[in-house]
UniProtKB/Swiss-Prot annotation:
Any one GO cellular component localisation term in the record: early endosome membrane
Classification via Pfam families: PX (PF00787)
CDD domains, per database record: PX_Grd19
Organism per entry: Gibberella zeae (strain ATCC MYA-4620 / CBS 123657 / FGSC 9075 / NRRL 31084 / PH-1)
InterPro entries reported in the protein's UniProt record: PX_dom, PX_dom_sf, PX_Grd19_PX, Sorting_Nexin
Name assigned to this protein: Sorting nexin-3
Amino acid sequence: MASDQDNSGLDAPGSQFHRPILQSMPDTRQQSFDEIYGPPENFLEIEVRNPRTHGMGRHMYTDYEILCRTNIPAFKLRQSSVRRRYSDFEYFRDILERESARVTIPPLPGKVFTNRFSDDVIEGRRAGLEKFLKIVVGHPLLQTGSKVLAAFVQDPNWDRNAW
């Protein structure tokens, strides 16, 4: 009579179906200081901060500082800081949509028509723009395949009309 362990000889030693029991050994190699505390293999950090309002009356606008830190080769600078207006983000998003038809580009925070220069509105917009950029720069196809992305977050002379 065959036991529960007997699979019609499939696991019998010498059988072509014999599966030896594998013991997993823990990795006991010590990591180096650089491996533990060094920068990750590829990283891209984006921060939208330091909003500033300029102008008077109908000519007022707010711009935002974009701080970028990365070691991805598609980006020319390891660290950069540029300033962009909301309208620049709108153009950038439109360019991304045309350039990257296979990628769904997230929406920007909505336009504000009343109290648009109040601290709460400016902070809400800053947070929304940062969320938008973090999603965009986190997309692997855009990180390496977008021509406009690196320029938008790193080039202080970025010209929306050049795209």
